[in-house]
């Protein structure tokens, strides 16, 4: 499924490569769609890290620290040095959505955005509208997702490759951008949060 997508993969070829019995696959999964669903769940949940995902409830008195922790979790989850299986599945689903796209969104992306939204809501002024709050969250989430999804293109642009920039530096850059965005949106954020490590 990773190399050929839902439409391009055949159960027969998968069974041949996995040295598995087609009858057993049909018995346990019943259909190609169900098998694909289980594979996708495994890929996303194995890399999900939802148990370690920072949430406001973990440190409600320090929402800015929780935002920085969430950004670190998010960047390290989606920006590995080599192409990630999760990003490959996301690219395939965007290009040719399977019947499971909504479930993928619900199980992975939506849960992390909801956790981010709680944190961001605790940082921004109470007068911030729901639309503004959502926009801030999408702008914090988006650059990392885009970089992960476009990784095959980014590696082919001379002079714009991510190179050997340490993941810690990428995380800190994303944290500063996120904090600056919220400060521009009216959040009171001390300059100490913008200091480079």
PLM region descriptions:
Residues 3-34, 38, 42:
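Helix-turn-helix
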Residues 37, 41, 45, 72, ...:
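Generic alpha-helical structural context detector
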Residues 52-84, 133-140:
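Hydrophobic alpha-helical connector segments
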Residues 43-51, 55:
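Conserved phosphoryl-transfer catalytic core
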Residues 87-89, 102-110, 119-175, 186-197:
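Hydrophobic/aromatic-rich alpha-helical bundle segments in the mid-to-C-terminal region
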Residues 32, 39, 43, 67, ...:
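Hydrophobic/aromatic residues within well-ordered alpha-helical segments
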